[in-house]
Amino acid sequence: MTTTELVVLLHLASPALPIGAYSYSQGLEAALDANLIRDADSARDWIASGLTDVLAHGELPFLAHQLARWQTHDTHALAAENAWFVASRESAELRRETEQMGWSLAQLCASLEWGDAARRATLASLSPIALPTAFAYAAAAHDAGADATLAAYAFGWVENQTSAALKAVPLGQLAGQRIIVALRGAIDAAVRRALATPPDAVNTFAPQLGILSARHETQYSRLFRS
């Protein structure tokens, strides 16, 4: 990995990226309301389960395949798989989340003129656009490798989930850092699993997450949009 590639992926994984990630908990707040999360240990277990049982089977391998599609500029597969992923979201909130963040990242890529004109035109044609599709575009525009791209995406997801737990449980800063440290190995394992997953084995089935997310839509008191 070059220094430039590292800096690009640190940029994409940064919580300062203006795509609104901080406003979503992806079901964590609903899990707290359902008493599935009570403290730092249960928060760590919930985030670990989301990483290994959901992200590693669905979002991460999907990201890897979309990265390959951008690299070869396979416009038909890009559009078809992007539409499939958006349709696979388990609730209205989760669908709006990936669409809003995907749109924001796509707008950022266009404004910064990342990628060549032909690929930018393809990016603009995808509406709605899922976050992993836009993230894959940004990585491909800088020639980032698949393993590092997936690691950056997974770390950003873990960091955002941890930040949501800090606010919602609530937890202290040290507890949050312990969660991130504890999940380093799980991130590596999730990336390796995702890279070994063929396109026809990508699986976004997550019934518990879907039910909790649907409940969150009518939850009485909420900090987050999902």
From Swiss-Prot:
Pfam families, per the entry: UreF (PF01730)
Disulfide bonds: none
Subunit and interaction comment: UreD, UreF and UreG form a complex that acts as a GTP-hydrolysis-dependent molecular chaperone, activating the urease apoprotein by helping to assemble the nickel containing metallocenter of UreC. The UreE protein probably delivers the nickel.
GO molecular function, one term: nickel cation binding
Identification of the protein by name: Urease accessory protein UreF
UniProt keyword Ribosomal protein present: no
Domain of life from the UniProt record: Bacteria
InterPro entries given in the database record: UreF, UreF_sf
Purpose of the protein: Required for maturation of urease via the functional incorporation of the urease nickel metallocenter.
Record localization: Cytoplasm
Family as reported in the entry's similarity comment: Belongs to the UreF family.
Keywords: Chaperone, Cytoplasm, Nickel insertion
An annotated GO cellular component: cytoplasm
Predominant place of localization: cytoplasm
Name of the encoding gene: ureF
